[in-house]
Amino acid sequence: MGDWSFLGRLLENAQEHSTVIGKVWLTVLFIFRILVLGAAAEEVWGDEQSDFTCNTQQPGCENVCYDRAFPISHIRFWALQIIFVSTPTLIYLGHVLHIVRMEEKKKEREEELLRRDNPQHGRGREPMRTGSPRDPPLRDDRGKVRIAGALLRTYVFNIIFKTLFEVGFIAGQYFLYGFQLQPLYRCDRWPCPNTVDCFISRPTEKTIFVIFMLAVACASLVLNMLEIYHLGWKKLKQGVTNHFNPDASEARHKPLDPLPTATSSGPPSVSIGFPPYYTHPACPTVQAKAIGFPGAPLSPADFTVVTLNDAQGRNHPVKHCNGHHLTTEQNWTRQVAEQQTPASKPSSAASSPDGRKGLIDSSGSSLQESALVVTPEEGEQALATTVEMHSPPLVLLDPGRSSKSSNGRARPGDLAI
């Protein structure tokens, strides 16, 4: 039948650049097709025409009946099948060898340029790289050519054409011979005078070989389908996923924020020197306990204090419950101012028992602000506001004015910081 060693060497080279399923397919091709066809099948079909006999003496009748019974010999049919299904693999091998050769030429050009620029050939310089730095390396860690890009497309087309050839030859074998050989074949073809009976040698053994080669072809077809799923379908599915959701891979690796970020509608995080400023004060039914302010002096100074918000002209809608909120804020600022300046000018109102009682009530009311009822909008603002108990920026204006006449509002003559 011929020597299959040359085709075997070529396919062995292609096996080095195939996937795992491709290597299994080539192993099946080597062992169960080429070796079986060369070792056993040729011996079974060796006496095929000589042992094909018909019960007639008409010249030429036996030949035409054999031609009708076997349009093509099984051996030659299977040989053509092996050649056709191996051709796409050989084309893929040619593409691999072309890429390897182009890489070798590129290295030779780099060495030639290096030798031309540096006669000492590489002392103090590395060879130039003509390719793009973004191009992936041609070989992997094991020194094998990577199946990617144009080479991957060639490999996929290789599998597709192998599958088509397998299906075509299986269908052709069914229409030509069927899957079973009968020992008796009746022929009425010219020049036979009438219907003659012809007999096939070793029909059972030949039927076994036909079924075996058909099973090997079906196994190769299944391997091709698995490899198409492994390469083509997975790559196609990955490409469609990346097309409709390009940030899916980044979202899987992106860490989640432990806390939600503050929106633009919320206030910025600032440090203030007085209690949190709520737009809706507590209901008058909430009663504050008179708790003394620790370390507070007995007589607050008579100073007019202008805060930074008042100087910038910010108007906050404040709803008073019997003037309690405004009085608390004024008393708080007076106490802070008294801590920063020595108490040299005690006022008559502060030294009186009524003034001392008012101081205790005001300090207790200011400390009770944290226990007031808070709306959801104010709760969101409180989360984004850092409250620190320290002195706010103060402006001392008209120290001689009495606290009874001051109402905490900004005057044209006040100086704001």
UniProtKB/Swiss-Prot annotation:
SUPFAM superfamilies: Connexin43. Residues 110-128 have a biased composition (Basic and acidic residues). Residues 41-71, 180-207 are extracellular. Residues 110-141, 247-267, 334-417 are annotated as: Disordered. One of its GO terms (cellular component) is connexin complex. It is found in: Cell membrane; Cell junction, Gap junction. Residues 16-19, 93-158, 229-417 are cytoplasmic. GO terms for biological process: cell communication; gap junction-mediated intercellular transport; visual perception. The chain crosses the membrane at residues 20-40, 72-92, 159-179, 208-228. It is a multi-pass membrane protein. Its main location: membrane. GO terms for molecular function: gap junction hemi-channel activity. Disulfide bonds join 54-198, 61-192, 65-187. InterPro entries: Connexin, Connexin46, Connexin_C, Connexin_CCC, Connexin_CS, Connexin_N, Connexin_N_sf. The keyword Transmembrane applies. The keyword Transmembrane helix applies. Residues 342-353 have a biased composition (Low complexity). Residues 2-15 dip into the membrane without crossing it. A hemichannel or connexon is composed of a hexamer of connexins. A functional gap junction is formed by the apposition of two hemichannels. Forms heteromeric channels with GJA8. Structural component of lens fiber gap junctions. Gap junctions are dodecameric channels that connect the cytoplasm of adjoining cells. They are formed by the docking of two hexameric hemichannels, one from each cell membrane. Small molecules and ions diffuse from one cell to a neighboring cell via the central pore. This is Gap junction alpha-3 protein. It comes from Mus musculus (Mouse).
